Amino acid sequence: MPKRIAVLVTNNFDDQEYLEPVEALRAAQHTICNIELRAGKVVYGLHGGLAVTIDRSIEQISIDDFDALLIPGGESPLALAHDVRVLHFIQAFNQARKTIFSLCDASLLLSEADVLKNRMITSIRAHALRVQYAGATYYDAELVNDNNQLISSRVPNDLPIFIHECLNVLKS
Protein backbone atom coordinates (compact mmCIF):
# COMPACT_ATOMS: atom_id res chain seq x y z
CA MET A 1 0.00 0.00 0.00
CA PRO A 2 1.45 3.40 -0.98
CA LYS A 3 2.54 5.68 1.86
CA ARG A 4 2.70 9.45 2.18
CA ILE A 5 6.20 10.77 2.79
CA ALA A 6 7.02 14.31 3.94
CA VAL A 7 10.44 15.52 2.83
CA LEU A 8 11.75 18.32 5.03
CA VAL A 9 14.11 20.37 2.90
CA THR A 10 15.37 23.91 2.33
CA ASN A 11 18.22 25.54 0.44
CA ASN A 12 21.59 23.79 0.30
CA PHE A 13 20.28 20.26 0.82
CA ASP A 14 22.55 17.46 -0.37
CA ASP A 15 21.40 16.85 -3.95
CA GLN A 16 22.15 13.12 -3.96
CA GLU A 17 20.64 12.51 -0.50
CA TYR A 18 17.42 14.13 -1.72
CA LEU A 19 17.19 12.84 -5.27
CA GLU A 20 18.04 9.15 -4.89
CA PRO A 21 15.65 8.36 -2.00
CA VAL A 22 12.84 10.47 -3.50
CA GLU A 23 13.18 8.77 -6.90
CA ALA A 24 13.14 5.33 -5.25
CA LEU A 25 10.13 6.20 -3.10
CA ARG A 26 8.21 7.52 -6.10
CA ALA A 27 9.15 4.45 -8.15
CA ALA A 28 7.61 2.36 -5.35
CA GLN A 29 4.39 4.40 -5.75
CA HIS A 30 4.77 6.39 -2.52
CA THR A 31 3.60 10.01 -2.49
CA ILE A 32 6.19 12.72 -1.83
CA CYS A 33 5.36 16.10 -0.31
CA ASN A 34 8.21 18.60 0.00
CA ILE A 35 7.74 20.72 3.11
CA GLU A 36 9.47 23.85 4.35
CA LEU A 37 8.53 27.19 5.85
CA ARG A 38 6.84 28.54 2.71
CA ALA A 39 4.78 26.71 0.09
CA GLY A 40 5.65 27.44 -3.52
CA LYS A 41 9.22 28.39 -2.70
CA VAL A 42 11.94 26.88 -4.89
CA VAL A 43 14.95 25.57 -2.96
CA TYR A 44 18.27 24.48 -4.40
CA GLY A 45 20.75 21.74 -3.64
CA LEU A 46 24.32 22.36 -2.52
CA HIS A 47 25.63 21.74 -6.01
CA GLY A 48 23.18 24.14 -7.66
CA GLY A 49 21.84 21.74 -10.24
CA LEU A 50 18.76 20.49 -8.43
CA ALA A 51 15.75 22.72 -7.79
CA VAL A 52 12.86 21.52 -5.62
CA THR A 53 9.50 23.24 -5.27
CA ILE A 54 8.00 23.21 -1.79
CA ASP A 55 4.53 21.68 -1.93
CA ARG A 56 3.24 22.74 1.48
CA SER A 57 4.40 24.93 4.32
CA ILE A 58 5.04 23.52 7.76
CA GLU A 59 1.98 25.45 8.95
CA GLN A 60 -0.30 23.82 6.35
CA ILE A 61 0.35 20.27 7.45
CA SER A 62 -0.35 17.86 10.25
CA ILE A 63 1.55 14.74 11.22
CA ASP A 64 -1.66 12.87 10.38
CA ASP A 65 -1.06 13.77 6.72
CA PHE A 66 2.03 11.55 6.55
CA ASP A 67 3.30 8.06 7.27
CA ALA A 68 7.02 8.92 7.28
CA LEU A 69 9.42 11.85 7.28
CA LEU A 70 12.60 12.03 5.19
CA ILE A 71 15.30 14.54 6.14
CA PRO A 72 18.18 14.74 3.64
CA GLY A 73 21.54 16.07 4.76
CA GLY A 74 23.61 18.98 3.54
CA GLU A 75 23.25 22.43 5.09
CA SER A 76 19.45 22.26 4.96
CA PRO A 77 18.93 20.59 8.38
CA LEU A 78 20.98 23.22 10.20
CA ALA A 79 19.14 26.02 8.42
CA LEU A 80 15.83 24.57 9.64
CA ALA A 81 17.03 23.84 13.19
CA HIS A 82 16.32 27.36 14.42
CA ASP A 83 12.62 27.39 13.57
CA VAL A 84 10.40 26.30 16.43
CA ARG A 85 7.64 25.19 14.01
CA VAL A 86 10.01 22.70 12.40
CA LEU A 87 11.20 21.44 15.78
CA HIS A 88 7.61 21.00 17.01
CA PHE A 89 6.68 19.10 13.83
CA ILE A 90 9.59 16.70 14.33
CA GLN A 91 8.74 16.28 18.01
CA ALA A 92 5.10 15.50 17.19
CA PHE A 93 6.17 13.06 14.48
CA ASN A 94 8.45 11.32 16.97
CA GLN A 95 5.81 11.23 19.73
CA ALA A 96 3.36 9.64 17.29
CA ARG A 97 5.99 6.93 16.66
CA LYS A 98 5.99 7.59 12.93
CA THR A 99 9.06 6.66 10.91
CA ILE A 100 11.82 9.22 10.44
CA PHE A 101 14.46 8.69 7.74
CA SER A 102 17.63 10.62 8.62
CA LEU A 103 20.64 11.17 6.38
CA CYS A 104 24.01 12.63 7.36
CA ASP A 105 23.55 16.14 8.83
CA ALA A 106 19.87 15.49 9.54
CA SER A 107 21.05 14.09 12.88
CA LEU A 108 21.82 17.66 13.96
CA LEU A 109 18.22 18.70 13.33
CA LEU A 110 16.95 15.68 15.28
CA SER A 111 19.34 16.57 18.08
CA GLU A 112 18.07 20.15 18.14
CA ALA A 113 14.47 18.85 18.22
CA ASP A 114 15.43 16.79 21.29
CA VAL A 115 14.10 13.49 19.92
CA LEU A 116 17.25 11.37 20.28
CA LYS A 117 17.10 10.40 23.96
CA ASN A 118 17.46 6.61 24.29
CA ARG A 119 17.59 6.22 20.50
CA MET A 120 20.10 4.48 18.23
CA ILE A 121 21.47 6.46 15.29
CA THR A 122 24.27 6.79 12.80
CA SER A 123 25.50 9.95 11.15
CA ILE A 124 28.78 11.28 9.91
CA ARG A 125 31.50 10.74 12.51
CA ALA A 126 31.86 14.49 13.09
CA HIS A 127 28.39 14.49 14.69
CA ALA A 128 28.92 11.46 16.96
CA LEU A 129 29.46 13.47 20.15
CA ARG A 130 26.55 15.80 19.42
CA VAL A 131 24.05 12.95 19.07
CA GLN A 132 25.50 11.23 22.13
CA TYR A 133 25.06 14.45 24.15
CA ALA A 134 21.45 14.45 22.93
CA GLY A 135 21.02 11.02 24.54
CA ALA A 136 21.45 8.71 21.56
CA THR A 137 23.67 5.69 21.17
CA TYR A 138 25.87 6.35 18.15
CA TYR A 139 26.99 3.62 15.75
CA ASP A 140 29.54 4.15 13.00
CA ALA A 141 27.65 1.97 10.52
CA GLU A 142 26.17 2.28 7.04
CA LEU A 143 22.68 1.92 8.45
CA VAL A 144 20.96 1.91 11.82
CA ASN A 145 17.32 0.91 12.16
CA ASP A 146 15.92 1.78 15.58
CA ASN A 147 12.68 -0.21 15.80
CA ASN A 148 11.48 0.94 12.36
CA GLN A 149 10.97 4.41 13.82
CA LEU A 150 14.36 6.01 13.15
CA ILE A 151 16.28 4.85 10.08
CA SER A 152 19.63 6.56 9.64
CA SER A 153 22.69 6.53 7.40
CA ARG A 154 25.95 8.44 7.31
CA VAL A 155 26.92 9.58 3.82
CA PRO A 156 25.85 9.38 0.16
CA ASN A 157 27.85 6.15 -0.29
CA ASP A 158 25.41 4.51 2.16
CA LEU A 159 22.37 5.41 0.04
CA PRO A 160 21.83 1.98 -1.58
CA ILE A 161 21.43 0.19 1.78
CA PHE A 162 19.52 3.16 3.24
CA ILE A 163 17.02 3.23 0.37
CA HIS A 164 16.58 -0.55 0.52
CA GLU A 165 15.80 -0.34 4.24
CA CYS A 166 13.41 2.60 3.79
CA LEU A 167 11.42 0.67 1.22
CA ASN A 168 11.33 -2.42 3.45
CA VAL A 169 10.14 -0.43 6.46
CA LEU A 170 7.38 1.18 4.42
CA LYS A 171 6.14 -2.28 3.39
CA SER A 172 5.53 -3.24 7.03
Residue ranges and their predicted role:
Residues 1-100, 108-120, 128-172:
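Extended, subdomain-level signal for the structured scaffold at the beginning of enzyme domains
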